[in-house]
Amino acid sequence: MNESFAEALAARTQDVLDNCTRCGRCFEVCPMTAPAGIAGKNAADVVGGVLDIIRGGSGSPASERWAQVCSGSGSCIPACPEAVNPRFMLALARVAMQRRASAEEQHKKGSAAFSKMGRGVRVLSRLQLPAGVLKRFRSEGPAETPPEVVFYTGCNVLKTPHIVLLALDILDALGVSYRVMGGPGDCCGVLQFRSGDLDASGRIAYHTTDRFAATGAGKVLAWCPTCTIQIGENVLPGRTGTPGAPAYDLEAFVVYLASQLDRLRPLMRHPVMKRVGLHEHPGVAGVCESAIRILQAIPGLQYVELAQPQVGYMCNTLQPLPAFKREVHRGILEAAAAAKVDALAGVYHACHRELCSHEADWPFEVVNFLELIGEAMGIRREDRFKRLKKMQDADAILVEVMDLVELHGLALEEVRAVIEKDLLGEQPLPLRSARVDRDAASAPG
């Protein structure tokens, strides 16, 4: 195990155990307890069970359930009177549960998850862009002078590369010097952390954060909320006061962009005459508020507030409760339709992958909010992921992307598997049109 990471995690774990008073306030404000069916449990007992799990005990079924369904909403953090981070506490509990398995099983599980993610990123990005454009996603070689910021993509946003291109276009227009880092080679280590393989997780995370420091940038702008939380809460606090302590600030890209609104506003010269609602997740503090501020600054755009549950930091964090996740998706689509929006805008890539194909069934477009900023600036990047996913036919998609398959030398069997699993397979709420097609096919002739 990476001893520095292990020691830091052990010390921070002890701080949680020492400082948590089991008041239960974090459990009481958690938005996931009702969907998980544990809202009526004694809060102090559930929290006490979580602490027992962290110590290596069995806890209780309710405590395990609470840890497993945590979606990282973050409402627990300001609620704690002892300044314990309950989101970190629940992450420690999940790690403790994973570490009941053998070290071999932990490593195998983490490696499998990493390989699956890497394959999806590699293939889907290449099915949308030629090699020359993909080079923009990873800065190579030393810079002559330190950049102002590192733009840290994380990994999975590269499956929807138009989002990354828009972010870089906006930074270019603002005149910000940056270095792009991300992809599996600069992973945050979260997949290994989730499997309990702390050796691999620490090694990967420390490699990436050391590379951030080597750029000399004073700020790292993280796109992905998973990376923001993994690095910002699980990794960097343990490096404080050590030789590896960061000399940079980690900030969510969207929050940074809102801080540059005075510079951004004059660049948004083209009216965007649309009613727009925002698909929100509260997990990373300030992101939704920042996105709304920016949308409200776009000329011609009418921002419409949509009723929606404040849960998770991205849609994929709701996966432990699939029925609840489907209801959340159905609810936001219905709210957008009721508000008569022209566009339902999301912030994050995972949400976009799961929701974008619903555009075929509803009277509004589903976009990333950066597309609206780009439109106001006269910048357009085609959302090829959405175009392909709306086809809903693996054979038709293969025909559409065959030129890029050949250009990148991809194996057809692998491409088909990724299309079926990673492109079409991520559909928590079935399309209404798909249900109609199924019903028609099964109707008696």
Language model regions located:
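Local cysteine-cluster metal-coordination motifs and their immediate loop/turn environment
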Residues: 17-35, 67-84, 153-156, 184-196, ...
